[in-house]
C-alpha cells in the first residue's frame, strides 16, 4: 500500500531544559528571561544565564549548608531565619558579601565586650597559699 501513515518522519526528541543540560537545579530559562526584561543590556548571551544560575545555586547551597549546621547545633530540625543569620554572620566571606543585608527575625550575634567580663584575679589564689 502507499506508505502514508505513522511511519515516515522523525520523532521529535524529548525537550531537555537548559538547567538539566548544565546540571543545575536553578532555572536557567527564568534567569535568561529576567536578564532580558530587566533592561541590563540590549542583548544577553547564551552563557550568561547559565553562569548566573550556577553562581546563585552555589551561594544558596553554601548558605543552606551553614544554616543547617547552625540548626543542628541548636538541636533543631527546621532552619529558621535565626539560623540563616548565625550562618551568614559567623562566616567571614558571606558576612562581607551580605554585610548591609537585614534578615527579618534574625536577631543579633551574641557578643560581650572583654572589658565587661569579670576579671580573673590572681591575688585570691596567692592569699590562700600564704
From Swiss-Prot:
The modification N6-(beta-hydroxybutyryl)lysine is found at residues 6, 37, 120, 126. The modification Phosphothreonine is found at residue 121. Residues 7-19 have a biased composition (Basic residues). The modification N6-lactoyllysine is found at residue 10. The nucleosome is a histone octamer containing two molecules each of H2A, H2B, H3 and H4 assembled in one H3-H4 heterotetramer and two H2A-H2B heterodimers. The octamer wraps approximately 147 bp of DNA. Belongs to the histone H2A family. This is Histone H2A type 1-K. It comes from Mus musculus (Mouse).
Amino acid at each position: 500500500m502507499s506508505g502514508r501513515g505513522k511511519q515516515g518522519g522523525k520523532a521529535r526528541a524529548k525537550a531537555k531544559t537548559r538547567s538539566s543540560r548544565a546540571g543545575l537545579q536553578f532555572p536557567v530559562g527564568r534567569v535568561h528571561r529576567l536578564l532580558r526584561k530587566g533592561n541590563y543590556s540590549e542583548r544577553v548571551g547564551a552563557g550568561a544565564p547559565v553562569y548566573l544560575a550556577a553562581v546563585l545555586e552555589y551561594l544558596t547551597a553554601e548558605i543552606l549548608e551553614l544554616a543547617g549546621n547552625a540548626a543542628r547545633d541548636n538541636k533543631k530540625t527546621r532552619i529558621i531565619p535565626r539560623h540563616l543569620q548565625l550562618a551568614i554572620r559567623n562566616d567571614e566571606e558571606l558576612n562581607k558579601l551580605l554585610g548591609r543585608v537585614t534578615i527579618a527575625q534574625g536577631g543579633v550575634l551574641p557578643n560581650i565586650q572583654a572589658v565587661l567580663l569579670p576579671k580573673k584575679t590572681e591575688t585570691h589564689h596567692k592569699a590562700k597559699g600564704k
